[in-house]
């Protein structure tokens, strides 16, 4: 059986469906007892990028959770190969001013226990999302709903949210402002999934903690969740079950990437991400797929370290960095050196964002600029009353993964050599960095990244909106805030895009963060598996409509 190598490369910014293609040397054993050949059942098995701590769509914030949730919940709409298709809602009407959406639910939409899916299930879920008592890490995604942000901030009662179940099959949604990507957003973000109030209240804080403490409305149901293996089986009550080819999918979390690759070679996985150390062995044989994840360093401008609150020092960090050399040293040139915030493959002005706007004309040079770095450093030291650069120490926090350590060690070397400052490294677990360190602002500089939740630059730019719950940098710029607010109400799509681009320019001019790279993520896929979709927004991978060819 041949292996198929798939790469998510920056150059392609579109949704692509995988089909059988080029192979790589060697063969992959097949040891699955319940494969389609032996049992008549169609099954795929693959690894997750990180642990799957919860299937509560409003208390999760990782791609792994989103990938699992979109398969187990029926959304109002569904993103299928880049197109918005009806799901639990069979149709919808949009008011002339773009503020009111009326969704008409299917009468045959059911939960896995046979109960009907109702408009009230969506109303309850969305109110739970923005309710401060829920403390959802993704509550901000409901800002587009009427009064959503005010409710999140405790300024209004949750009953004032712009969502109303008119009757069992009619849901009326009122937006805070026209949102061109709204149908895409609710079709790819698990936070907008329906929830059964009786089930949530029955299990309380244990809701969705295990497979049996939930009911499911989507194409699959979770049947077990033990020992870092999550099993999903086809939902016979799903309204579109005849379009679902797989009988079962197993998601595995294996921390060691070498072990993941060994499992794939042994035939225990159908799909695996290629460890960075092995990418050079495969990348010339790769197919091209898009991935919208960009990596950067957050700078906590309000940390206890005063140098990071200084604009000139932040600019010195950015100009001192040779991103091309960094990419070669840290990533073996397997990623793409990047000097912006917004993924250039997003749609803008009838083309892509990268084509519409010349990033290099307003950002830092990819090769760095030592003279400018020195100029900004000297200005910062003068303003801060620091005599010697060697008296400056900054700390970079990252996860305990080997690849992350290699990345920050490369940054450490470049910054120390170019600026003469001292750079310390602190490593914590993945769970801690996103669960405590970043949200609690317990860091100075932090290596992280972001992938767009929807096909719009706003998804990246809102990270630097002063009142965003994901403003880990504690960055504040009234002009940026005003541009982002204005963009939400701007009916002229081209003018709106210009406002968003100006916000990106202002953020870069402030040195608010340190852009590093766009991820080129490589995957290997069994040739007998087809129909998996890759996206540069939100999920990255969608296996709902996957199929397995007969062996």
Language-model segments: residues:
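Extracellular/periplasmic solute-recognition and catalytic clefts
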Residues: 223-233, 250-305, 324, 328-329
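Alpha-helical secondary-structure segments
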Residues: 118-125, 168-174, 218-219, 246-248, ...
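N-terminal lobe/hinge region of extracytoplasmic solute-binding protein
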Residues: 47-96, 215
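Structural transition elements
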Residues: 336-380, 401-405
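Extracytoplasmic/peripheral linker and loop segments enriched in polar/acidic and small residues
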Residues: 365-366, 422-433, 459-527, 551
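Gly/Pro-rich hinge or "lid" segments in bacterial periplasmic/extracellular proteins
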Residues: 63, 175-244, 248, 258
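Long beta-strand-rich cores associated with HINT superfamily self-processing modules
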Residues: 523-551
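Surface-exposed binding/hinge segments that line
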Residues: 123, 138-198
């Amino acid at each position: 059986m041949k292996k198929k190598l798939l790469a998510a490369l920056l150059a392609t910014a579109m949704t692509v469906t995988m089909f059988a293609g080029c192979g790589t040397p060697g063969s992959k054993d097949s040891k699955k007892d319940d494969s389609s050949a032996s049992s008549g059942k169609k099954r795929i098995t693959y690894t997750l990028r990180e642990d799957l701590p919860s299937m509560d769509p409003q208390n999760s914030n990782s791609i792994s959770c989103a990938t699992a949730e979109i398969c187990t919940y029926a959304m109002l709409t569904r993103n299928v190969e880049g197109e918005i298709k009806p799901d639990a809602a069979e149709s919808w009407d949009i008011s002339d001013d773009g503020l009111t959406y009326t969704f008409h639910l299917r009468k045959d939409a059911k939960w896995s226990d046979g109960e009907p899916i109702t408009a009230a299930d969506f109303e309850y879920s969305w109110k739970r999302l923005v309710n401060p008592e829920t403390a959802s890490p993704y509550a901000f995604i409901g800002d587009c709903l009427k009064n959503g942000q005010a409710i999140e901030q405790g300024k209004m009662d949750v009953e004032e949210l712009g969502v109303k179940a008119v009757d069992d099959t009619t849901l009326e949604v009122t937006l805070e402002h026209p949102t061109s990507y709204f149908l895409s957003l609710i079709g790819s973000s698990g936070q907008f999934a329906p929830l059964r109030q009786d089930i949530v209240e029955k299990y309380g804080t244990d809701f969705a903690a295990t497979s049996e403490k939930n009911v499911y409305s989507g194409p699959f149901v979770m049947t077990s969740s033990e020992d870092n293996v999550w099993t999903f089986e086809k939902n016979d009550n799903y309204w579109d079950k005849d379009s679902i080819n797989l009988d079962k999918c197993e998601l595995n979390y294996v921390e060691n990437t070498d072990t993941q690759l060994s499992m794939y070679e042994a035939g225990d996985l159908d799909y695996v991400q290629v460890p960075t150390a092995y990418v050079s062995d495969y990348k010339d044989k790769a197919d091209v797929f898009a991935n919208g994840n960009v990596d950067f360093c957050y700078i906590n401008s309000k940390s206890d370290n005063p140098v990071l609150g200084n604009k000139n020092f932040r600019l010195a960090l950015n100009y001192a960095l040779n991103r091309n050399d960094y990419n070669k040293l840290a990533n073996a040139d397997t990623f793409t050196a990047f000097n912006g915030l917004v993924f250039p493959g997003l749609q803008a002005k009838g083309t892509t964002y990268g084509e519409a706007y010349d990033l290099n004309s307003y950002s830092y040079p990819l090769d760095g600029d030592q003279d400018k770095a020195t100029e900004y450093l000297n200005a910062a030291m003068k303003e801060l009353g620091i005599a010697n650069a060697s008296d400056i120490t900054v700390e970079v926090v990252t996860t305990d993964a080997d690849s992350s350590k290699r990345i920050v060690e490369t940054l450490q070397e470049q910054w120390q050599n170019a600026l003469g400052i001292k750079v310390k490294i602190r490593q914590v677990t993945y769970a801690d960095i996103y669960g405590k360190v970043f949200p609690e602002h317990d860091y100075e500089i932090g290596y992280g990244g972001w992938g767009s939740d929807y096909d719009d630059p706003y998804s990246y730019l809102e990270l630097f909106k002063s009142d965003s719950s994901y403003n880990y940098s504690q960055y504040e710029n009234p002009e940026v805030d005003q541009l982002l607010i204005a963009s939400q109400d701007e009916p002229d799509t081209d003018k709106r895009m210009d406002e968003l681009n100006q916000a990106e320019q202002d953020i870069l001019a402030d040195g608010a963060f340190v852009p590093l790279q766009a991820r080129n993520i490589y995957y290997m896929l069994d040739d007998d598996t087809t129909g998996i979709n890759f996206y540069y927004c939100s999920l990255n991978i969608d296996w709902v409509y996957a199929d397995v060819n007969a062996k």
